């Protein structure tokens, strides 16, 4: 870790890490703090009785100073965690059970994900390359890398000292622009990486025309890594949309597939815009071509999750109504309800389902859909959900209240007591009891059933 004036955030960051990892030693490099960051760090680890050291380095650039930080910590542990002072871990992160690789890449982000090498063999020598958006490079032979998947993510913070500067991204863009031309003149491939992150910084500073210029350079001209070219196309699609250029927006969204046929974000974003423009035939043509996509592509740069969580099927379910492909449209809607974890898309599909009532009632497997709707209806204010639920309830009522198989009566002390009231409606009483018997997963735990008439 390298720090400068992080007194306002460093304890929060260290507390967050301590929830997930037990450290044997720590090395943090300070590059000129004037707010007492160094003493806060020393006192924190002293209170935990964890040995370590603060190292002072003069600031030059990220690649240089991160390399100095690695050298300061070299060989003082078996493995080294690299972490920024304002980042935070979330979810259920666990360290590898067996350390089989020299480099482990950790997951960043939730809605948009990417991986970075953050956990490395500290008996090997490493360095960072680049003045900004630097990358890790081994200085000696290493035993491969491994992506650490799991139910966790690291949030890249925006509360550190550097993020306080409102001109941060503008300054970054100029640094990267100058670095690009310097490396280009020297004939170094590092220039291509600088071009991509120059585009990123122009985009983050809301300089749209400059961002388009540099993303276009990456997408159309430079021999960048295919992931950078893919993402550049998606960004160009979004930026041209902001400028009101529909044709170029769609062009670059679709061009993305030239660089990675496994990723579908560009195609799905194009379909979303085409659907809104009532170009339904094009939506369905694209859906037929790409519908057998991989729902969980790995090892991608800046992956948008929403296109893999039902957004593609949502567009197809609407466009299919206009292209007389209702069976396919209904299957898309059904797939969303049964499979997606995206609550926004799932809630939106209920309005679409109103146009598929005939298909819904004819669906022989709609009981599974009813159970899912039952589990979420109390969390939704969408009246369309209640309409669909009522239709499915009427359709499956006989299945829900059919006479169940008997259960064994236990002769034990009564611990679980279930009571009912009834009033001259034996038929309704039977339906209630039968529905409980059919759907309570732990009904065997009921010791005594009691009815007051």
PLM features: residue spans?
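Short, acidic, metal-binding catalytic loop of nucleotide-sugar glycosyltransferases
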Residues: 15-24, 28, 434-446
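Conserved donor nucleotide-binding strand/loop of the catalytic core
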Residues: 39-68, 72
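A conserved acidic beta->alpha catalytic loop
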Residues: 16, 29-41, 58-59, 451-453
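Active-site beta-to-alpha loop of glycosyltransferases that engages the nucleotide-sugar donor
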Residues: 1-15, 32, 244, 420-431
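Cell-envelope/extracellular polymer assembly enzymes that use nucleotide-activated donors
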Residues: 25, 414-419, 447
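Residue at a conserved register position within TPR or TPR-like alpha-solenoid repeats
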Residues: 202, 240, 274, 319-320, ...
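Catalytic-site signature of metal-activated, phosphate-bearing donor transferases
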Residues: 63-70, 83, 87-213, 217, ...
């Amino acid at each position: 870790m390298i720090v400068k004036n992080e007194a306002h955030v460093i304890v929060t960051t260290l507390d967050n890490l301590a929830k997930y990892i037990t450290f044997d030693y720590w090395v943090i490099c300070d590059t000129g703090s004037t707010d007492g960051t160094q003493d806060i760090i020393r006192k924190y680890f002293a209170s935990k009785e964890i040995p370590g050291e603060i190292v002072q380095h003069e600031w030059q650039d990220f690649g240089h100073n991160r390399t100095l930080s690695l050298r300061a910590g070299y060989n003082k542990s078996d493995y080294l965690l690299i972490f920024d002072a304002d980042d935070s871990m979330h979810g259920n992160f666990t360290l590898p059970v067996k350390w089989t690789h020299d480099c482990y890449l950790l997951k960043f982000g939730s809605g948009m994900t990417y991986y970075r090498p953050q956990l490395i063999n500290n008996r090997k020598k490493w360095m960072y390359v680049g003045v900004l958006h630097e990358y890790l490079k081994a200085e000696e032979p290493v035993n491969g890398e491994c992506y650490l998947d799991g139910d966790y993510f690291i949030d890249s913070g925006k509360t550190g000292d550097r993020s306080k500067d409102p001109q941060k991204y503008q300054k970054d863009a100029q640094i990267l622009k100058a670095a690009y031309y310097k490396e280009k003149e020297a004939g170094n491939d590092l220039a291509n990486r600088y071009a991509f992150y120059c585009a990123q910084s122009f985009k983050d500073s809301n300089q749209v025309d400059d961002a388009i210029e540099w993303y276009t350079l990456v997408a159309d001209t430079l021999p960048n890594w295919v992931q950078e070219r893919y993402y550049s196309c998606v960004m160009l699609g979004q930026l041209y949309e902001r400028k009101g250029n529909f044709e170029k927006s769609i062009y670059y969204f679709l061009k993305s597939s030239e660089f990675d046929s496994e990723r579908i974000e560009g195609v799905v974003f194009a379909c979303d815009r085409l659907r809104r423009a009532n170009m339904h035939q094009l939506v369905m043509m694209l859906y037929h071509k790409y519908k057998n996509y991989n729902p969980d592509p790995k090892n991608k740069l800046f992956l948008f999750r929403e296109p893999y969580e039902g957004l593609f099927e949502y567009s197809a379910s609407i466009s299919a109504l206009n292209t007389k492909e209702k069976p396919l449209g209904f299957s898309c809607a059904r797939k969303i309800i049964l499979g997606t974890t995206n609550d926004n898309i799932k809630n939106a599909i209920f309005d679409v389902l109103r146009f598929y009532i005939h298909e819904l009632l004819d669906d022989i497997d709609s009981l599974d859909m009813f159970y899912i709707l039952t589990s979420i209806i109390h969390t939704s204010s969408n009246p369309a959900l209640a309409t669909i639920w009522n239709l499915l309830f009427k359709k499956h009522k006989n299945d829900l209240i059919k006479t169940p198989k008997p259960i064994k009566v236990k002769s034990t002390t009564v611990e679980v007591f279930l009571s009912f009231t009834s009033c001259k409606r034996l038929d309704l009483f039977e339906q209630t009891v039968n529905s409980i018997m059919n759907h309570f997963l732990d009904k065997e735990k009921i010791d005594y059933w009691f009815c007051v008439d």
